């Protein structure tokens, strides 16, 4: 965190942590900052009195950043060591029920964040854009948890909870990131993925959601996914064709080798019984010649 970015003031503070306007972006971690007493008490007085759940620090730091007037970055400052992303839950796997509960908590917190943004009377367009940006971040974090922390057997059930909580459109949009990334990864490999690969499993989940959203016509990146799906089908077909051709070539090689070995043995027998130049050998040659001529004349 020890980035020497100098002083941030007013609107810059929230833009630094909650937008892509200023780079590099600051993290929204309440625990890596020191606060002036009056300022932080004033910020907390503007927050909801409701109990927050999973990822609650995003809401807290959003309000703090918006209410603050100055943010000073200090380089080479050593204090509490905090591991971003390990939080209260660590990195263990979730059950479908636990994931469902946590994603509901995030959605409830997002609604509270929107409520706070709507209470800001100046520059409503800015707060509308910022809350929408936060929504995308929440969806991205949730789908990352869904991919990495839910067993494959629970992912279908977990995504049903997302659809019920966030709606079909948002649920479909958040699925495109891992789905397209997985498809592009498969497309770069010279191998045929198994039928239960994540790309196919996640695609089946998406197929259930798309009919709820006007058949996907209004979904960003849906066309990109469909093109990728077709490209992967073509890619797999090409690999299968090459494998079949290689198998056929190998079979022909084995058969030719067998014929060669058989022919070699027969030639040895003929050479032994009817040596070259012998009357019997010449007689056989004449008979074969007449037989071939008769065959051509028919």
Residue locations for each model-derived region?
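Donor-binding/catalytic cores of nucleotide-activated saccharide
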Residues: 1-76, 80-100
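Short, basic/polar, glycine-containing "phosphate-handling" surface segments that engage DNA
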Residues: 28, 127-128
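Inter-helical turn/loop segments and adjacent helix faces that build the functional surface
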Residues: 47-50, 119-126
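Membrane-interface aromatic/basic loop that binds lipid-linked glycans or pyrophosphate carriers
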Residues: 143-298
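Catalytic core of nucleotide-sugar-dependent glycosyltransferases
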Residues: 78-86, 92-123, 137-173
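P-loop NTPase catalytic cores that bind/hydrolyze ATP
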Residues: 57-69, 131-147
């Amino acid at each position: 965190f020890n980035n020497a970015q100098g002083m941030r003031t007013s609107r810059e503070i929230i833009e630094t942590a909650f937008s892509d306007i200023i780079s590099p972006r600051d993290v929204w971690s309440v625990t890596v900052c020191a606060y002036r007493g009056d300022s932080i008490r004033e910020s907390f007085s503007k927050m909801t009195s409701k109990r927050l759940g999973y990822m609650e620090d995003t809401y807290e730091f959003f309000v703090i950043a918006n209410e603050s007037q100055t943010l000073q970055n200090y380089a080479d400052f050593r204090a509490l060591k905090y591991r971003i992303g390990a939080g209260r839950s660590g990195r263990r796997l979730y059950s479908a029920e636990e994931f469902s509960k946590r994603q509901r908590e995030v959605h409830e917190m997002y609604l509270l964040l929107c409520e706070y943004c709507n209470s800001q009377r100046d520059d409503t367009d800015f707060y509308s854009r910022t809350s929408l940006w936060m929504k995308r971040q929440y969806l991205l974090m949730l789908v990352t948890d869904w991919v990495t922390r839910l067993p494959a057997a629970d992912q279908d059930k977990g995504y049903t909870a997302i659809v019920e909580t966030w709606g079909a459109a948002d649920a479909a949009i958040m699925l495109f990131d891992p789905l397209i990334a997985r498809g592009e990864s498969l497309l770069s490999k010279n191998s045929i993925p198994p039928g239960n690969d994540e790309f196919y499993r996640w695609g089946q989940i998406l197929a259930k959601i798309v009919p709820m959203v006007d058949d996907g016509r209004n979904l960003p990146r849906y066309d990109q996914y469909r093109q990728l799906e077709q490209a992967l089908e073509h890619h797999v077909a090409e690999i299968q064709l090459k494998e079949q051709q290689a198998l056929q070539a190998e079979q022909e090689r084995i058969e030719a080798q067998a014929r060669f070995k058989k022919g070699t043995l027969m030639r040895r027998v003929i050479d032994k019984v009817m040596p070259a130049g012998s009357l019997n050998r010449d007689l056989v040659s004449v008979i074969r010649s007449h037989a071939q001529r008769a065959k051509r004349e028919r």
